[in-house]
């Protein structure tokens, strides 16, 4: 035991010194190497050599595996799950699997419903319009699935013309949605029964 740390230099003996020329106290990953924080993990393998409460960071994102919800994927999410990929940087993690109930998506599903939009993260009705009223393309009907995108975003639109049901002058005619003069003929000159 040339370094006097209590671990023998014979590589085939019991508890052989992995660092025979340097006195050390590591016992977890290898015997007899330096362990600055005294947690048992050698400084060679310890991702946090100065912190005895943390030892391993499998994905290299500076979070210990014990606090990292995605130990094999580097990430910077902090709000719903810690240490998972967060493409848009809003703090909510990107989805890793599809929600079990995509119609009623919520934060407990563990991921950002809109991972490419930093202003939106929650989409309760799963229609693609975020529930944050101050974010981009906010859902005016956050609990009702909808495809409207002309007068307001994310509200029911039975004829899929872009105008929400409550504001569509022709709710069953997809080529007309507005009638400014109220004469029963649509304002879209290319639609069915246009106003002359």
What is each of the regions a protein language model found here?
Residues 1-196:
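Extracellular calcium-associated, cysteine-rich motifs in secreted modular proteins
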């Amino acid at each position: 035991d040339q370094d006097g740390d209590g671990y023998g230099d014979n590589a085939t003996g019991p508890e052989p010194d992995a660092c025979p020329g340097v006195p050390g106290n590591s016992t977890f990953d290898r015997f007899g190497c330096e362990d600055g924080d005294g947690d048992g993990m050698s400084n060679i393998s310890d991702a946090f050599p100065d912190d005895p409460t943390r030892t391993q960071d499998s994905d290299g994102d500076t979070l210990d595996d014990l606090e990292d919800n995605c130990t094999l994927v580097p990430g910077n999410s902090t709000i719903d799950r810690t240490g998972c990929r967060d493409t848009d940087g809003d703090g909510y993690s990107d989805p890793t699997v599809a929600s079990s109930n995509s119609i009623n998506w919520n934060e407990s599903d563990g991921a950002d419903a809109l991972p490419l939009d930093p202003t939106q993260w929650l989409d309760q009705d799963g229609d693609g319009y975020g529930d944050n009223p101050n974010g981009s393309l906010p859902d005016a009907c956050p609990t009702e699935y909808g495809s409207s995108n002309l007068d307001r975003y994310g509200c029911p639109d039975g004829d899929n013309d872009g105008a929400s049901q409550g504001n569509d002058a022709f709710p069953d005619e997809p080529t007309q949605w507005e009638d400014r003069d109220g004469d029963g003929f649509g304002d879209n000159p290319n639609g069915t029964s246009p106003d002359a």
